[in-house]
Amino acid sequence: MPNIKITDRLSNGETLLLDGGTGSELQRRGANVLKGAINKKDATSQQKTWAWSATTNIEFSDVVRQVHKDYLRVGADIIISNNFWTIPSRMNSIGLGDRWEEYATAAGENAVSARDEENPEAYVAGGIAAPTMQSLQEVPVPDIEYMGEKAFHKEYYDHAKLLADIGVDLILAEYLGFVSDSVAAVDACAEVGLPVFLGIRHIGQNGKMQYHNANQNNTTEETLNELAKALEGHPVDAILLMCSNPEAISAGLPIIRDSFNGPIGAYPNIGYNPTGPITNSPTLTNQLPSGGKDILQTQNYSPSRLAEFATKWKKTGAQIIGGCCATGPEHIMAMKPIVKD
């Protein structure tokens, strides 16, 4: 366990290196991250990710731990546990709802043990992704509206408490797309007594959030300014823009910097299709530790190109920089000199 609290390092002005994608890296290394992902009601319909990568925490635990270690070896200060969708609602979707705690515990323990073995001074962020059950609706609505306040709170609190008991250093409530969900998730996670970081997904290149607010037929996108205002007085220790393309993050960071009084960060998606096949990319054959296997489209954002974005983000004020879907250890290694300079 680290001797210095992560919040103290951020308060002192340090910039920390976050890890890269976990689920996509697991898939690239041959782990089955799509167990239960096909919509069984209609096998010809578009695949859904359901509990994407959750089952790997037990079935491919050695690969999960190795991915964590590889990120630490290239310099990551923070790794995110592979708890992305080990939450009850998502595990229910593949018939494993009664075992969610088993898979969630395995994910947390995999990350903590990898950290303890590789670099005890690194931080483990207990990652909890938004249920996004509203994505099943014709008109998306916030999870808290779809699930109800009580069920939403329990989903987050129970997961955060489990991870805190395992020994993670902070909670990362990530993949949030609505303001109301973001505020409620932060409040629930903070009850376990750890720092809480917030990850906002799929922002547009106009710097706005993913969804329109469907209430009252309001078709105005929620904004990052509105998010920051709504979070005033709530226990959020950092806001990160995530799972968005680098250009969108570049547009959004100045907005969140100017409206939020706290550390900000970025971890972009660089083109990964979670239900797509693994392909061989000769472009990256010599760069990938897996020997050339590449998830779709990453050749558009080489490690060196992503490092150029990291330079901009650091100048903008980002203190936590890493990667999301399709980024791998090679991307994090390329960003290290910029982030840690």
Region roles according to the model:
Residues M1-D341:
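Domain-level signal for soluble alpha/beta catalytic cores
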